[in-house]
Amino acid sequence: MVRKFRYENDYPIVDTTCGKVHGYEYDDVIYFKGIPYARAERFCDPKAYTWDGVFEATAYGYSCPTIEEPALDYSLDFARKQELKDEACQNLNIWTPALDNEKRPVLVWLHGGGMSFGSSSEDGLCEGDNMCRFGRVVVVSLNHRLNLLGFCDLSDFGEKFKNSGNQGIADMVFALKWIRDNIAKFGGDPDNVMLFGQSGGGMKVTALLQTPEADGLFHKGLIMSGVQGGAMCDCNGSGKKMGEILMEETGCSNIEELCKVPVKELLGAGKIVRKKLKFLGYNAGEMPFYSDYYLGDPLIHPFRSETAHIPLLVGSTFGEFNAPFSYGISKHRMTDKEMEDKIKETLGEDLASKVIPLFKEAYPERPLVDVLSMDYMFRSYIRSYMKRRTELNDCTWEYIFNLDMPMLGGVSPLHGNDLGFVFNTTDRAPALQEPGVTEKVQKEVFDTVMAFAKTGNPNNGSIPAWEPSKPGDFKALVFGKETAVRRNFDAELNDCMAGELLEKQVQFMYDSVSGRIGG
């Protein structure tokens, strides 16, 4: 295979509203990386950033600082990378097939990591080159402020900090405005923009649907494992206590001094106070702040009628955070009795007797013991989301990614195992490779996402006919070895598991996230 690379003094160059950017072309895709779309003082609103001359957009920009320490990554199902961090993190990346006047769909990727960590460049599975190359679309990914830098409400300390609790969202809105004003020069259609994100990225899609300033800047959305509630819900109430303790921990006498504290010291102080504040019921600066700018989590507050017409795909993986249970067993070597005994040992006799027949009915293709690696947290929140949103429209579809990883005798799909299938990049993760299966399911998922991005309807020739869900009639497309649409198939099973175990699962997830961001 011959792959062409091109980089000239005058090509490829695009003159944006901020200044000229210089990228490169490789293998029929034109890349622009690290384009600054804004800059901001700490805790303050983003502002336009301009430059003279030509900006070299050939390397990823800074990601938002976090409290995490760099660590080696040993995963076989992702393609993790390290990145540089700085508060000047408002930058975006663009992949396009051509710099022409053709109006291609624009897909804007919002990275995962809750609202506290992550970046647009940390996972090679989420790079937009293959999506661009094989889907003939324009792909954009972006970085924005996170954690205390993006979501610490300091509005009690002055008008300058009025929206400090939502600056992460404000950055995303600013980026979407930049895309609206510039993407046509990159071969994209500003009137056909799809937001998509996984985990925290999906949460960002739900947040932008609840943000009036984002209205008109996007036209459809894909929410992957991103409908979350419980311990992950809104920061309600004033962040004044957080600000006071941060100043105390950093030795600052006023908010202006806090704005100048070295970022590592600031985030270190946040590590000390965040978990204590969370469980005392105070705003801990980790999620969007309910206000007239952001109108709240739709599982708690009303869905906005202004965005109810926007088509959505909403889904999750079969296993999510419960999938690691699969690591410790060889399920294909177990007898039915051994599976039932394991379920009874783990769940107790009463719960096991209820869920075993329900699981057999919902997932007849799966070994019975997989009920222990089945997600019921994300699925519960998605079902609540679907019930509420389908009362407002007929343009919301739900899916479940149900393909095991071919390792350790078959591991239920983890949180994020659908990423490579959406981006058409499964070849970058060894543990996703199963001959004759991976390519089939990748084509089904990828074609579905491309159809949805182009038309607002996910139906295409690679999947069965799939109608949007309606109240009381929920039709989930279950991607797997035998992809099929299933109607109202897991409600009783999910309610049974969640009713007994949801609170523990939410706490487990919260503790896992806290461990990563220093809670």
Regions found by a protein language model. Name each.
Residues 74-255, 303-324:
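Serine-hydrolase-like catalytic core of hydrolytic proteins
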Residues 379-519:
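Mobile gating loops/cap/lid regions near enzyme active sites that modulate substrate access
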Residues 307-354, 486-519:
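C-terminal, loop-rich substrate-recognition/catalytic regions characterized by aromatic stacking residues
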Residues 107, 173-176, 180, 206-209, ...:
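Non-transmembrane alpha-helical segments in soluble domains
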Residues 348-392, 397-402:
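Alpha/beta-hydrolase fold catalytic core
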Residues 181, 215, 224-339, 369-391:
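Substrate-access "cap/lid" subdomains that shape
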Residues 78-80, 161-166, 229-234, 299, ...:
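Active-site rim elements
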Residues 1-166, 190, 432-445, 455-463, ...:
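Non-catalytic accessory segments of hydrolases
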